[in-house]
From Swiss-Prot:
It catalyses: NAD(+) + ATP = ADP + NADP(+) + H(+). Transmembrane segments: none annotated. The keyword ATP-binding applies. Signal peptide: none annotated. Its EC number is 2.7.1.23. GO terms for molecular function: ATP binding; metal ion binding; NAD binding; NAD+ kinase activity. The active site is at 81 (proton acceptor). This is NAD kinase. NAD(+) binds at residues 81-82, 155-156, 166, 183, 185, 196-201, 256. Keywords: ATP-binding, Cytoplasm, Kinase, NAD, NADP, Nucleotide-binding, Transferase. The keyword ATP-binding applies. GO terms for cellular component: cytoplasm.
Length: 301
């Protein structure tokens, strides 16, 4: 994004949304502090309904997530990566840029350190940022040719049995060409953003955020030859299932939304039309994030 584009975006920051799911008093207090700080800076502030009510804010500051998407030019997510994922899946439909204050564990998507939150937010609101766009995946479940379920994911889509410790048999097609069959606990289909999440735990590769690629990672395959597969990001992936599988299957979207699948269904996966727009401060370095979050060694010399 050019500097002129950054200035143009920054100049639109009139209404700012504050969202999250505080699990303790200290996180709720941070929502309150950020709200009052933004008001002091002259911004119109919308706070997610549940949080605003907990803070006893007036009605004109309360809004649903969809209303924040419709009216805010920036949303601040206070929480961990899970909070970012759940809010971003909705806000990306409105092309709302997001920046996160990390109150979770890893914080791959929430850059701002809570100890320096005000200085870093001030820098962001003054235009000292760049925009990074990341693509989402869309899953469509077809039954006898009709769409019966649909969902988006920022990290990954996971096909798995609804019951624990059951294997399933399925075929995978890439762009209508047969790719492979598999007997396993399931299949992870991950974006570059999700390559450092569940996919990584299953032995998948790390994909840098700007790669136009999708990772297909088997879950406990019943073969020694199965390996993760990286395909072009514009690929259309289809999965169908053996009729003798257990009747209850699911596709999980970011481990937050589950779609039911029957054995005679076909799951179609491709890029979503929506994009996640993350704001990063100028000193953001993806490789530094990997090193600090994953415990990589520092330079030896």
């Amino acid at each position: 994004m050019s500097q002129d584009s950054v200035k143009s975006l920054q100049s639109t920051f009139k209404t700012v949304g504050v969202v999250g799911r505080p699990r303790n008093d200290s996180t709720l207090q941070m929502h309150k502090n950020i709200f009052h700080w933004l008001c002091e800076q002259g911004y119109q502030v919308l706070v997610e309904n549940e949080i605003g009510k907990a803070l006893n804010l007036s009605e004109n500051h309360l809004a649903s997530l969809d209303q924040i998407g419709q009216h805010a030019q920036l949303a601040i997510v206070i929480g961990g990566d899970g909070n970012m994922l759940s809010h971003a899946r909705i806000l990306c439909k409105y092309n709302t840029p997001l920046i996160g204050i990390n109150r979770g564990n890893l914080g791959f998507l929430t850059d701002i350190d809570p100890k320096n939150a005000y200085a870093q937010l001030e820098a962001c609101l003054n235009g000292e940022f760049f925009v990074e766009e990341r693509f989402l995946l869309e899953a469509v479940v077809k039954r006898h040719g009709e769409t019966v379920a649909r969902g988006n994911a920022i990290n990954e889509l996971v096909i798995h049995p609804a019951k624990i410790a059951h294997m399933i048999d399925f075929h995978v097609y890439i762009d209508d060409k047969f790719a492979f069959s598999q007997r396993s606990d399931g299949l992870i289909v991950a974006t570059p953003t999700g390559s450092t999440a569940y996919s990584l735990s299953a032995g998948g590769p790390i994909l840098t955020p700007q790669l136009n690629a999708i990772a297909l990672v088997p879950m406990f395959p019943h073969t020694l030859s199965s390996r993760p597969l990286v395909v072009d990001g514009n690929s259309k992936i289809s999965v169908n299932f053996a009729e003798y599988n257990i009747p209850q299957l699911e596709i999980s979207c970011d481990s937050q939304l589950a779609l039911d699948i029957c054995c005679n269904d076909v799951v179609h996966i491709q890029k979503s039309p929506y994009k996640l727009r993350l704001l990063h401060l100028h000193n953001y370095n993806y490789y530094n994030v990997l090193s600090s979050k994953l415990g990589w060694l520092k330079k030896l010399f």
